[in-house]
Amino acid sequence: MKSPLPWLKRRLSGRADSEHAQNLIRIIITTLFISYLGWRYQHTHGDTLMATWLILVGELLVSLGLMVAILLRPQVSHTRRLIGMLLDYTCTGAIMAIQGEPASPLYAVCMWVTIGNGLRYGSNYLRAATAMGSLCFLGAILISPYWKANPYLSWGLLLGLIAVPLYFDSLLRAMTRAVREARHANQAKSRFLANMSHEFRTPLNGLSGMTEVLATTRLDAEQKECLNTIQASARSLLSLVEEVLDISAIEAGKIRIDRRDFSLREMIGSVNLILQPQARGRRLEYGTQVADDVPDLLKGDTAHLRQVLLNLVGNAVKFTEHGHVLLRVTRVSGSAEDAVRLRFDVEDTGIGVPMDMRPRLFEAFEQADVGLSRRYEGTGLGTTIAKGLVEAMGGSIGFKENQPSGSVFWFELPMAIGEPLKSSTVRVPTGALVDAPEELESSNIIAFSNPFLRHRARVRSMRMLVADDHEANRMVLQRLLEKAGHKVLCVNGAEQVLDAMAEEDYDAVIVDLHMPGMNGLDMLKQLRVMQASGMRYTPVVVLSADVTPEAIRACEQAGARAFLAKPVLAAKLLDTLADLAVSTRQLATPATTVQVATSFEGVLDSSVLDELAALGMGEEFERQFVRQCLDDAQNCVGDIERDGTCSDWEQLRESAHALRGVASNLGLAQVASSGGELMRMADWQLQAEWRLRLSTLREQLKAGKDALDARVQGVKDGECSPRSNE
């Protein structure tokens, strides 16, 4: 038989008020009084005692009935509240009238019930309780010989029963008003921060975008130095905006925790890549120590953990002029088979924290000294953000001195043990832009120093539609997209987007979220209606300075394919477009083609390599590109065979995803299509068909290789030349 307690807890936990708690207290107190009377006067008989006992039993039965009513109908009920109040005062007043002096302590119960109703239900109930309690006590005064014999005491207590709750009512209303005003002020602050973020991000978008375009042009040494200064200043300003938004989200309780499997040591390595050069520039010793008993594979919010470490270790580097900065990770408790609690210590030999600042160390906009905000850059939000994120992840954070100088900031986090990570071989997601030289070398992907050139070599030209009400933003996006090889049409409103899409087809749309008239969300909803009625599907990327969780979630629900924050980074924008290009590519006949043997029709879409050739990088470059991409494709096929043999269907889909991306880069239509089919197959389908699919892939890849060899040989011998389709 199951215990009813879990059901009772679930039934009462979601109630809007605490009526059930007050009723439970009433039941407990009444039961105790009945038990006491039964024990104390078990051999005593009398009408007064019997009347008192019957009153208490009646109150207990009615209270039990109220509790049943609460369980059956958990919604707020003003009728039940009034019945409970009337029950309390009538029973208390009746017992005080019957018992006289022995029941005089019940006056405190009467006052307690009055104040309790006010605290639980507000001023209106406090005034109603005051009236009920006063009338019941007045009845006791008029009936009981004891209270009649003490008129000064009786009328004084009655006056107190009226005056004290009324004074408390004035305090309660003042407190309620203060809480309401504080809530409104906090909401106004959040709106102000969101608006200021939008206003800051909009000009930053133009500044950041144009400097990225400028960085790809020919500059002399002095111009490069000036450009680097501008970009560093823009990044610093953006960092300040991000910090203010982070603290706003933390205060509003809107931090979302996303727990995933990750490698702790790899994550710490990524932090070191950012902060170690800064420490080296300040001539500091910088190191990390991870204890041997700390597991490497964990499950947690790696993004927020990295942000906490960047804040704390970054502060240590910033406020240390001599000595060292050390990050230590140790295991506090937990079994390696289940979960662990890890402690992170950030030790430095810097300026330390003065005694008078320590109580306010984790408060917003605080630094160890007023003058430090001038000497060191920053808002003073780093430790506050770290505290909010650590507590949101279920941990604790603190500070201690580091003798003889400096400080140690520490935090502890509970972590689950992660699942073994997939193959460590470098995977290049479809359309991904790989920036790390080590990854590029190990994966044999051609690396161009110019991100726009790299994008043009891998992604075919697309027709883009851009909508933004700010001319500077439209200009930035147009320059970035055209430099990446795309054809761009810019409009200044959502209505123009719908009109343009009704006239022509576009491969992708980039739209600002907040525009005069119809905004981006309304445009998305209208576009989905149009597409449901037969219009060609077009992915939409939302670009906005409003990066609140509500805005991002609203865009996802409206059908946006991606959300990018202003100021847009060229690499992030190009990465997103590369992913869209692979998923929506229509292998149509282009304006410029290269003639290949008819036996290769359907195998090779030569327009992809034609666009690469149009960049004018030479025949040798094209041959090298083809050779290395074919090697990548062959490796992906080998990975598919290995994954199928191991029955690792999730990894097999990732291998097929990588193969589709490489094949699309070469224009191998059949291979790309087969890779896409593998990605969409269920586990049971893969288990039954993967060997047959693998055999087909190998045949298609061989045919594609022959077609590419024929093309490259034809270009080399001068047998085929570009021609224009009329």
From Swiss-Prot:
Catalytic activity: ATP + protein L-histidine = ADP + protein N-phospho-L-histidine
PTM (free text): Autophosphorylated. Activation may require a sequential transfer of a phosphate group from a His in the primary transmitter domain, to an Asp in the receiver domain and to a His in the secondary transmitter domain.
Effect ascribed to mutating residue 17 to A: Cannot interact with DSF. Significant decrease in EXP and EPS production, as well as in biofilm formation. Substantial attenuation in virulence
Domain Response regulatory: 463-581
Pfam families, sorted: HATPase_c, HisKA, Hpt, Response_reg
Domain Histidine kinase: 195-417
4-aspartylphosphate found at: 512
Stored InterPro entries: CheY-like_superfamily, HATPase_C_sf, His_kinase_dom, HisK_dim/P_dom, HisK_dim/P_sf, HPT_dom_sf, Sig_transdc_His_kin-like_C, Sig_transdc_His_kin_Hpt_dom
Residue intervals passing through the bilayer: 23-40, 52-72, 95-115, 128-148, 152-172
Superkingdom: Bacteria
Residue intervals on the Periplasmic side: 1-22, 73-94, 149-151
Activity-regulation annotation: Binding of DSF to the sensor region causes allosteric change, which facilitates RpfC autophosphorylation.
Main subcellular location of this protein, as a coarse class: membrane
GO molecular function, one term: phosphorelay sensor kinase activity
EC number(s) on file: 2.7.13.3
This protein's GO CC annotations: plasma membrane
Oligomeric and partner information: At low DSF concentrations, interacts with RpfF.
Record remark: domains: The N-terminal input region plays an essential role in DSF perception. DSF binds with high affinity to a 22-amino acid sensor region at the N-terminus. The response regulatory domain, but not the HPt domain, is required for repression of DSF biosynthesis.
Protein name, as recorded: Sensory/regulatory protein RpfC
Organism: Xanthomonas campestris pv. campestris (strain 8004)
